[in-house]
């Protein structure tokens, strides 16, 4: 089981690092590259650089709120 945990941890770390690298390059470096350069076809338009994290944050906060609400409802049922 320890080997599987390490593999999952390595996979999650690799995914996180690749997303961070992609987003950093997209937001910080790409605006300084000419718009007709071939590298632009690998990235979404700059508008999405703000929209994607905002919607991801809203979705995360919504899921956390639903989870907390369900836990609170279950704890009320146990007390009653």
Curated annotation (Swiss-Prot):
Pathway: Protein modification; protein glycosylation. The chain crosses the membrane at residues 10-30, 50-70. Keywords: Endoplasmic reticulum, Membrane, Transmembrane, Transmembrane helix. It is found in: Endoplasmic reticulum membrane. InterPro entries: DPM2. GO terms for cellular component: dolichol-phosphate-mannose synthase complex; endoplasmic reticulum; endoplasmic reticulum membrane. Disruption phenotype: No visible phenotype under normal growth conditions. GO terms for molecular function: enzyme regulator activity. It is a multi-pass membrane protein. One of its GO terms (biological process) is dolichol phosphate mannose biosynthetic process. Regulates the biosynthesis of dolichol phosphate-mannose. Regulatory subunit of the dolichol-phosphate mannose (DPM) synthase complex; essential for the ER localization and stable expression of DPMS1. Belongs to the DPM2 family. Component of the dolichol-phosphate mannose (DPM) synthase complex composed of DPMS1, DPMS2 and DPMS3; in the complex interacts directly with DPMS3. Associates with the GPI-GlcNAc transferase (GPI-GnT) complex. This is Dolichol-phosphate mannose synthase subunit 2. It comes from Arabidopsis thaliana (Mouse-ear cress).
């Amino acid at each position: 089981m320890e080997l599987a945990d390490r593999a999952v941890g390595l996979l999650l770390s690799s995914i996180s690092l690749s997303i961070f690298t992609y987003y950093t390059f997209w937001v910080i470096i790409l605006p300084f590259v000419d718009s007709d350069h071939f590298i632009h076809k690998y990235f979404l338009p700059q508008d999405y650089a703000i929209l994607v994290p905002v919607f991801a944050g809203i979705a995360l906060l919504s899921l956390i709120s639903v989870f907390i609400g369900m836990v609170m409802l279950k704890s009320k049922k146990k007390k009653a």
